[in-house]
Amino acid sequence: MISLVGIATLILIAIALSHQRRSINWRTVSVAFVIQVLIGAFALYVPWGQTVLASLSGAVASLQLYANKGIEFLFGGLSSPHMFEVFGSGGFVFAIRVLPMIVFFGSFISVLYYIGVMGWIIRLVGGTLRLLLGTSRIESMVVTSAIFIGQSEVPLVVRPFIAKLTRSELFAVMVGGFAAVAGSVLLGYAGLGVELKYLIAACFMSAPGALLMAKLMEPETEAACTEQVVEALGQAENRPTNIIDAAAEGAQVGLRLALSVGAMLLAFIALIALFNGLLGWAGNWFGYPQLTLQLVLGHVLAPIAFLLGVPWHEAVLAGGFIGEKLVLNEFVAYADLANYLTPAKAAEAGVPLLSVHTQVIVTFALCGFANLSSIAIQLGGLTGIAPQRRQELARLGLRAMIGGTLSNLMSAAIVGFFISL
């Protein structure tokens, strides 16, 4: 039940960081929290909800089988299961088995947008949030879009209106981008060994969670002037000519994302190894040769992990993963977490096996784009659309990243409560 204390703590932190505490709309905040809790309960505690989630994750996972056809054509025997017979776990080549999934899923999502399926889903979910929470149509559409597309692409959904948004709406747009992950990378995380059903649940919990934290930290104090928003979805600039063009464009976007992910992982993992080597060398002088970045971050964030529901004896490890995600990115953190998920991987890496309880909580805590480098990504995208608001965006950047982080941690705390029942 420690997770209840964690939930209260996260809300208090958001209130403490609020720009206008007296203007907080408690109806909006309360309903957003209830929706986030209900999604968590539906996915993890209600038997029927677990069945639906399992079916949904099974459907998404089946896409991997179709993606494998393209992967096998490009890489031949290098993508064959026989690689595991020869190299053991070394037969899993990230660049072959995970990055191409991002390319395929990017193309698939683009096709769904072109034929109107994604637009219908976003309008349905976003419209429901708008009616229940009383938030503007822009905010509701953007946080819903963030479930499926990346933080750089989210503002493009409502590009003509970015310059006219109130400060609170703009902050909600930014928090929504930080709190979610793109649907195109879900299969990438799953390819590392992370449970797909938990990733899907975390994505849907991020929408109300983002609005919860955004409206606590930056309540609405102005009159929104964007309620006459047109159906931006389907009327976007540079819309694909036909379904083939949509598939090709999505594949190109997916390729850029895959190359970016691969480059970041190569650089960051190598830099972490270098930094850990230096820390170990320095720590050796003081009798701590095992000193690493993960260990330092783990001790700093262990209390937060504990409040989420992680047992204290695993809190340092969990805190290390959360710290990696904040300082570097979620892909690096998930790649590190993957070593702790199964007995075989843990034995090979020489690390302890995490309990299922902790695995679930950490999976939810990491499922978001909120990290320091993402601030630059968001500012670059938004200032390109609304350069006249550059200074305001810069002031909101760090606070929005914190809001996205609090949203992810709130999902983890809620899940921690339900799995402890």
What kind of region is each of these model predictions?
Residues 252-350:
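Transmembrane helical segments that form the transport core of multi-pass membrane transport proteins
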